[in-house]
Amino acid sequence: MLENKKHKKMSLSGKSLLMGTLSTAAIVLSASTVNAATNTDTVDNANASQVTTVKASASVNKNDNSGLKENATNDKVAGTETNLNSSLNSGKETSSQVNDSKEDSSSTQVGSTPISSAIINNGKASSDLNQDSDNISDHFKDNNSQGQSSTSSEKTELKGKIKEIVNNSGIDVTKLTNDQINNLNKVNFDNDPQDGTKLTLNDLDAIGQALIRRDPKYAVPYFNAKEIKNMDAAETKDAQTGKTETLEIWDSWPVQDPITGYVSNYKGYQLVIAMMGMPKKNDNHIYLLYNKYNDNEFSHWRNAGSIFGYNETPDLQEWSGSAIVNKDGSVQLFYTKNDTSNGKLNDQQLATANLKLNVDNNGVSIASVDNDHVIFIGDGKHYQTYDQFSNGKNRNRDNYTLRDPHVVEEENGDRYLVFEANTGSNNYQGEDQVYRWANYGGNDKFNVNNFLSYFGNNDDQALASVANGALGILKLSGDQNNPTVKLDDVYSPLVTSLMVSDEMERPDIVKVGNKYYLFSATRLSRGTKGEITRLANKVVGDNVAMIGFVSDSLTHGYVPLNGSGVVLTASVPANWRTATYSYYAVPIEGKENQLLITAYMTNRGEVAGKGNNSTWAPSFILQLNPDNTTTVLAKLTNQGVWVWNGDSENKNMIGSLEKDSPNSAALDGEWGKFIDWDAINSYSLKPHQPVTPNVPTTPEKPENPTTPNTPDTPRTPEVPTTPVKKTTQSELPKAGAKDGIAATILGAISSMLGVIGLAGISKRKRNN
């Protein structure tokens, strides 16, 4: 027994000696290891002043008739300032001047009044604005306190054209990592397939900056919140329950004259079709509303009921579209069928139906709905199909769209549909789009910074790789009352937003004189530049906009209005009563330089308070200038005005951003109210799901959550905020004299501990 105890003691001593020996060896190894280590510079975003000049190439569609085969290239407005710090202090834009006229000299009242104090975004106050704005543009601020980089013998070299571009950008090439250089060397400078005009990342950035600085040329006017009412005609029989319910109303469109686009005078009435449904329910169906032509009174609107009856279900919904009058007096409706049955994620299809109406002393009623059928589900080449989407990669981040058909009739009787979609296999989504230089659209510094920013942010890069928004066009065939689509009449897109955005909603073409104006509602949060969305949400409290393009031809040649495409931008927080969206432009009879802008007001789900339902907004005037610019005018109407006349203007609707003003744009209690983005977006359509970022730090709480495919599904964020980057080094620092001394001391301490006899160390499990 004594021998055994002695043996055990000797064994413990042996372990201690072994630990001492190993620790001594560790001193030598640690010193050599530290001396051999090199530091990889981290890359962060910093603010940089960038002046960009952009040229938009508007290419002809592939499948156009021979008479349409021409290229139109137009210069965008130059001099877009992209320094957010400076733009936040500016209420004006140094772009082209607005043509003044005696009649229309009034301008929108939206100015530079601070609004950030009115906003709380998911618990995070906007006082961090300056800190966040410092992280927008310049990707190359060196965070390494030692300023060291890899030796030239270890560095990969830039090659070819990208080398010159990086040098021109003013970026220190020595600060680039090998991974960054390898990615830059993969940049694709080839010409794009001819898929119409590009909405570039630089355009998206400029749109965001205009929104953030609340540029008065583009900002939606402030409305007097105390004047806003729910719609009387929204108290009606619900399409799903068959019972009288209080409904909300949002996306709406008038029945229009097929040639002029004016709101049709249909036997003395104006007709509007609208999406309606119960608050906080998965209830999305379309109804017919009517009022006497030229009647400006909101309370006079009446509801003719659900177009497709009262046995509707949440699984089969109708979304927005357009409508015109046929030669026989019937109404041709174009709309979106949305199928969410059997687990589908918004299987959208373009559809049409023929409506025959009765008009008598009791008003307007629906006599019959005939020839209801789907006319287009995508062709796979020009436009993505649901099967391509559902079988694709990164589906949890992808956003499938094929909706919002807008009908246009040419003078020769040919009818076309313009619609929201995603690009097909001819120019498809994918990681290769992030390498396509034409998608960036800015100067060298902007392009390089943002290219590397994608590869430093897994979330934005993943979104960019699936972003493939498109505004499409096709030609209709067959009888007016029962149209069809031939595959040969499916043209390539008018506008694409590959890598930039996955969603450009509700396209609307208005012909004014000899020009075609193409508009679309969108959100910065559907784009792939997360920083600009977060900043917009902090400064303004919302990120919605309307973009626009102009061409001399219906089927090709569109160039962005105002240089970047920005036409309208949000001006108040999304949870205020006076927040607006789903903008729709209507031509004004007798006015070739003005359009009437309609919208819905108050986001769905009672986000502005109990009983404050989504309703029609007051309309306002958009000035069209001869130099392809636009200006918002402070000419407001009652709610629900679709036909502008001499009695339409109502100055009592003009609001103010002053908190205690009697015409404040905010209701009592809205100023400084917490913005719950889950609730704001809970009725949107995007099925994105968040992905855990592959970084060691804890992500911040997302400020811009996405929307689910169905309104009753619990909401998750669409664009999680970029996680806070670690300020500590993730690798061993490059050794200096102090580092060597520190390593020696640590090794000596380890030796002492080993000699003392930490025998238990040998029992620890290794972490594999």
Swiss-Prot record:
CDD domains, sorted: GH68
Residues annotated as signal peptide: 1-36
Any one GO biological process: carbohydrate utilization
Biased composition (Low complexity): 691-727
Main localisation: secreted
Disordered: region residues: 57-158, 688-736
Active site, UniProt feature: D251, E505
Record field: pH dependence: Optimum pH is 3.5-4.5.
An example molecular function term from Gene Ontology annotations: levansucrase activity
Record EC number: 2.4.1.10
Any one annotated GO CC term: cell surface
Keyword annotations from UniProtKB, A to Z: Calcium, Carbohydrate metabolism, Cell wall, Glycosyltransferase, Metal-binding, Peptidoglycan-anchor, Secreted, Signal, Transferase
Pro-sequence residue ranges: 736-768
Site (Transition state stabilizer): D404
PROSITE patterns: GRAM_POS_ANCHORING
Polar residues: bias regions: 57-68, 80-99, 106-134, 143-153
Motif segment (LPXTG sorting signal): 732-736
Binding site for sucrose: W250, D251, S320, R403, D404, E503, R523
Notes on how activity is controlled: Calcium ions are required for optimal activity, but do not seem to be essential since addition of EDTA causes only a 48% drop in activity. Ca(2+) may play an important structural role and promote stability of levansucrase.
Catalytic activity: [6)-beta-D-fructofuranosyl-(2->](n) alpha-D-glucopyranoside + sucrose = [6)-beta-D-fructofuranosyl-(2->](n+1) alpha-D-glucopyranoside + D-glucose
Protein's cellular compartments: Secreted, Cell wall; Cell surface
Family membership: Belongs to the glycosyl hydrolase 68 family.
Function: Fructosyltransferase that catalyzes the polymerization of the fructose moiety of sucrose to produce levan polymer and the fructo-oligosaccharide (FOS) 1-kestose. Is also able to convert raffinose into a fructan polymer and a single oligosaccharide (most likely Gal-Glc-Frc-Frc) in vitro; however, L.gasseri strain DSM 20077 is unable to ferment raffinose. Also displays sucrose hydrolase activity.
Name of the protein in its database record: Levansucrase
Annotated source species: Lactobacillus gasseri
